[in-house]
């Protein structure tokens, strides 16, 4: 191999190494800003294809329906505890702040926050469904895939 080819090979290797390093650093920097979307069932059992569970402390968005009878408000503050469900599971959420006007039991919501211990989400933002015709695309897809409710929603409360 002549000297000119060796120099070109070294330059090509250096460019590829620099490109790989740049991509790695960009992905590492963006990792803290990416909020992955999960349903309650995916938090409990993992994503469908990979069965990967979210980690404690991970920022995420959770979409589902507010469980009827689960909304508990603290009388001394703006703290609210409620549960979000889908066909595969239920996740508890804590939020401190003013809830959207359209927030109510049985309605679709998307909460953004951090996953805590025991699959508890500490929400920093709560988004309620806008009107009866609008559903966020991620929530609509997830609800179509599992359009059943957990059995606890159907239990007769009188007995």
UniProtKB/Swiss-Prot annotation:
It is a single-pass type II membrane protein. GO terms for biological process: cytochrome complex assembly. It comes from the Bacteria. GO terms for molecular function: heme binding; metal ion binding. The chain crosses the membrane at residues 9-29. Residues 30-159 are periplasmic. InterPro entries: CcmE (IPR004329), CcmE-like_sf (IPR036127), NA-bd_OB-fold (IPR012340). Residues 130-159 are annotated as: Disordered. Its main location: membrane. Residues 1-8 are cytoplasmic. GO terms for cellular component: plasma membrane. Keywords: Cell inner membrane, Cell membrane, Cytochrome c-type biogenesis, Heme, Iron, Membrane, Metal-binding, Signal-anchor, Transmembrane, Transmembrane helix. Heme binds at residues 130, 134. It is found in: Cell inner membrane. Belongs to the CcmE/CycJ family. Heme chaperone required for the biogenesis of c-type cytochromes. Transiently binds heme delivered by CcmC and transfers the heme to apo-cytochromes in a process facilitated by CcmF and CcmH. This is Cytochrome c-type biogenesis protein CcmE. It comes from Citrobacter koseri (strain ATCC BAA-895 / CDC 4225-83 / SGSC4696).
